[in-house]
Regions:
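Sec-dependent N-terminal signal peptides of Gram-positive bacterial secreted proteins and lipoproteins
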Residues: 4-30
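Residue-level detector of conserved, function-critical positions
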Residues: 30-390
Length: 390
């Protein structure tokens, strides 16, 4: 089971020392003579730092708020909680403290992972040395007993659990709704449906354990019940079926990526080349590219000879192949990468936001989230960077 190590860590950077007493430079400021280094700047006034092999938290003034005594410190920063609590590990055991280092969950677990609002998946070994998983609440009370060999995160009101060698499901009230009986549960939970495996084959069930798609596939690679399709594989080839198990795209491709059934463009791979087919399985763009993305706003990013550009639906090159990576258009701009920096271009290839950002998201509501020199903020369509306030 994935544990707290699922949380993403960024590349370490050295903290900037305060050069003049009283002068507050943007970003994290350290008092003089501090010899700890930055592990991760959250961009909102909290920074994981380390000294030797011990970790703690400082604020943007360089004040230590979580002592540098832990083996690991990772914020419980699931975006919809934002409680400013921290998972900490000491003596090989995990627990939870708040930003004042008050212990909220005693350091007694072998792993700890966010489950749902105010609940955590935790594990501990029994007397025989076997690892058992349970769920505790914010008061450290077990709401699901330690009798499972795997528990996964809650999604759409249900969560996979494993007992012995079989998987079943619990609901958001921690009640068993499907007894453990499946060999495997994929990560694809969609609108009340789950891809599960039995006797070496995959199918799809609903929350009432009714079989929606029979167990006849080697894998279920993607499910989208809203748009009515499922990407599956059979006999080493990939195709698309609908939610009634009717074949939409025959099983003849190495892989299928971006799907847009409504507009008739499906990105597929054949003989290690990317191309596009329509929902009648007719090739609309030849299999000649090294990579391909979904069409957005009339254009798709594709790669050739290691560089990315954009084509239209007639396979005409609109933006030349000169980027290291490319993403879809949003609000008229596309995120592209060049020389390890991110910028944004318009549909003519004109650079609108220069290549000076270390990370970036696509535009939404007139701005895009970006990171620059350890600072996070937004950039607008005029290229103006606005850092987040501490």
């Amino acid at each position: 089971m994935d544990t707290i190590q699922k949380v993403f860590k960024k590349l370490s950077i050295f903290l900037v020392f305060a050069m003049v007493i009283g002068l507050m430079t943007p970003g994290v400021v350290l008092a003089k003579n501090k010899d700890y280094k930055v592990e991760l700047d959250y961009g909102d006034g909290y920074v994981t730092v380390y000294k030797g092999n011990k970790y703690g938290i400082v604020n943007d003034k360089g004040k230590i708020i979580i002592p540098i005594v832990y083996q690991e410190v990772i914020r419980d920063d699931i975006e919809y909680t934002l409680r400013y609590n921290f998972f900490v590990k000491k003596g090989g055991k995990w627990g939870l403290v708040n930003k004042h280092n008050k212990v909220l969950i005693k350091l007694q677990y072998d792993s700890i992972q966010w489950y749902g609002d105010k609940h955590y998946i935790v594990s501990k070994k029994d007397k025989r040395g076997y690892v058992n998983y349970g769920i505790i609440n914010f008061n450290n009370k077990a709401v699901l007993p330690f009798k499972y060999s795997d528990i996964r995160e809650l999604y759409g009101g249900w969560a996979p659990v494993k007992k012995g060698k079989k998987y079943g499901f619990i609901n958001d009230k921690f009640k068993t709704i499907i007894k453990p009986q499946y060999d495997f549960v994929s990560t694809y939970l969609s609108d009340g449906y789950a891809s599960v495996a039995k006797s070496g084959h995959y199918g799809v069930i609903n929350k009432k354990n009714k079989v929606i798609i029979p167990f006849e596939y080697d894998s279920i690679e993607q499910m989208n019940f809203d748009d009515g399709y499922i990407i599956a594989s059979k006999s080493g080839k990939t195709g698309i079926i609908d939610t009634k198990n009717k074949v939409i795209i025959p099983f003849e491709y190495d892989s299928i990526g971006a799907v847009d059934l409504e507009n008739g463009f499906i990105c597929a791979i054949k003989s290690d080349k990317y191309g596009y087919i329509n929902k009648e399985n007719k090739v609309v763009i030849p299999f000649e590219y090294g990579g391909g993305n979904k069409f957005t706003e009339g254009l798709a990013g594709v790669s050739k000879d290691g560089k990315w550009g954009f084509i239209n639906k007639d396979n005409e090159v609109i933006i030349p192949f000169e980027y290291d990576d490319a993403w879809g258009f949003s609000e008229g701009l596309a995120k592209v990468k060049k020389a390890d920096k991110y910028g944004f271009i318009d549909k003519t290839g004109k650079v609108i936001v220069p290549f000076e950002y270390d990370d970036a998201n696509s535009f939404s509501d007139g701005s895009a989230y970006v990171e620059k020199g350890g600072k996070t903020g937004t950039v607008d369509k005029n290229g103006v960077f606005t850092p987040y306030e501490d």
